[in-house]
Amino acid sequence: MDENEQSARDVEQRGASDESNSAIRPLLQAPGNLQLPHRITNFFIDNILRPDFGRKKEANITRYEDNHGARENHNPTGPSTGQVGSTVPAEEASTTHTSSGGKEAEIESEEPLKPRGENVDQCLGSESDSSQSNSNGQTGQGMLWPAWVYCTRYSDRPSSGPRSRKPKKKAASKEDKRPRTAFTAEQLQRLKAEFQTNRYLTEQRRQSLAQELGLNESQIKIWFQNKRAKIKKASGVKNGLAIHLMAQGLYNHSTTSKEDKSDSD
């Protein structure tokens, strides 16, 4: 007896669940509550890198919409055709034409939602990638790009446009360099006399000499530096500190001329 009662309860519960499912199905299949078919996908790296990634889902959606539209077109019991059909045949033809036109307008209003992913950045997912791949196939390119191409910053797709590159800096020409100062004979004589007196000028002495000769302080400073370098290179005499460091192996910058080296050899 207990087993029979348990089986009867199971049958009643199944019947109640079937009734609830049958009551919910018309709501889900209503035109206002259009439910898209859901497909479980395995998001492995191999699947994502394939060119046909995301195309199957959109194909199922278009098939569902086509089947749904065909059912509506072949539905004989329409509220508008049933009411007008009892009056005049001409009006029936006009009403069927207007109703079909309204359905076409609804379909056209739904169609612009598909190519929206073509103009937006394609890093949103498989749906945007599938729409882009379909558009490429329609244009006749015959090239399928995988999903990861649209998530890279520098992609070779045509929609990315020309790449912006930083302009290269022009190499400094010789004309941009500061020209050498052409000293007059009087200025050279005065500079040589000052150099013989003291090879190193103080700041005050350099300022006064610049005012007397009509030169810049930097010009006088550079002339003195060059003059000291020439004498040092010609004489080959090393500084005492340099000799001390060379003895310890801490200084090996040779400042002697090639002639001195050849003579020593």
Curated annotation (Swiss-Prot):
Annotated spans, Disordered: 1-30, 65-142, 155-180
A cellular-component GO term for this protein: nucleus
PROSITE patterns reported in the protein's UniProt record: ENGRAILED, HOMEOBOX_1, HOMEOBOX_2
Any one Gene Ontology BP term: anterior/posterior pattern specification
Low complexity composition-biased segments: 125-142
Signal sequence bounds: none
Superkingdom per UniProt: Eukaryota
Keywords in alphabetical order: Developmental protein, DNA-binding, Homeobox, Nucleus
Pfam family, one: Engrail_1_C_sig
Location within or outside the cell: Nucleus
DNA bind region: 176-235
Annotated Basic and acidic residues bias: 1-17, 65-74, 103-119
An MF annotation (GO) of this entry: DNA-binding transcription factor activity, RNA polymerase II-specific
Polar residues: compositionally biased ranges: 75-86
Membership in a protein family: Belongs to the engrailed homeobox family.
Record-linked PANTHER family: HOMEOBOX PROTEIN ENGRAILED, HOMEOBOX PROTEIN ENGRAILED-2
Designated name of the protein: Homeobox protein engrailed-2a
Taxonomic source organism: Danio rerio
Gene: eng2a
